[in-house]
From Swiss-Prot:
Modified residues (Pyrrolidone carboxylic acid): 29
Entry GO terms, CC: extracellular space
Name under which the protein is recorded: Prolactin-inducible protein homolog
GO MF annotation terms: aspartic-type endopeptidase activity
Disulfide bonds: 65-91, 89-123
Cross-referenced InterPro entries: Ig-like_fold, Ig_E-set, PIP
Biological process terms in GO annotation: proteolysis; regulation of immune system process
Originating organism: Macaca fuscata fuscata (Japanese macaque)
Glycosylation sites recorded in the entry for this protein: 105
Record-stated family: Belongs to the PIP family.
Keyword terms: Disulfide bond, Glycoprotein, Pyrrolidone carboxylic acid, Secreted, Signal
Subcellular compartments: Secreted
Length: 146
């Protein structure tokens, strides 16, 4: 009874503070998971007709799996394995690593692109999600040819 009398005498700010402490803070905004994390590595310089290897590691912090289509694109045409496109299941416990070996005679800007798509037969039991906010992620690097 005394506690009830105390609450009626307390200020509205105190009541709000007690309510927030009792219910706990909303952790949804503090614990935002990243959809795609990219680590794209290519050499910064290369010689003419030298074979260059591009490596892209893709991972997610989401608990659900996604179907990821991964490819490279550039501002100038590049022949060979540069044009390979990969489609794999991406889950939080297993990052995917992709490799491209190619030759170029010109300085080129390369974008590593990850599209989250809807495709059956890629993830186990076709259990995959598609983000609502954004489904294309990319990183751009420049390869200077000397």
């Amino acid at each position: 009874m005394r506690l009830l009398q105390f609450l009626f005498r307390a200020s509205p700010a105190t009541l709000l503070l007690v309510l927030c402490l009792h219910l706990g803070a909303n952790k949804a905004q503090e614990n935002t998971r990243r959809i795609i994390i990219q680590n794209f590595e290519i050499p910064t310089t290369a010689n003419r007709d030298e074979e260059v290897t591009a490596v892209l590691q893709v991972k997610t912090e989401l608990k659900e799996c996604m179907v990821a289509k991964v490819y490279l694109t550039s501002d100038v045409p590049v022949e060979g394995a540069f044009n390979y496109k990969y489609t794999r299941c991406l889950c939080d416990d297993y990052p995917n690593t992709y490799y491209w070996d190619f030759h170029t005679n010109r300085t080129v800007q390369i974008a590593a692109v990850v599209d989250i798509i809807r495709e059956l037969g890629i993830c186990p039991n076709d259990a995959a999600v598609t983000p609502i906010s954004k489904n294309r992620f990319y990183t751009i690097k420049t390869l200077v040819v000397a």
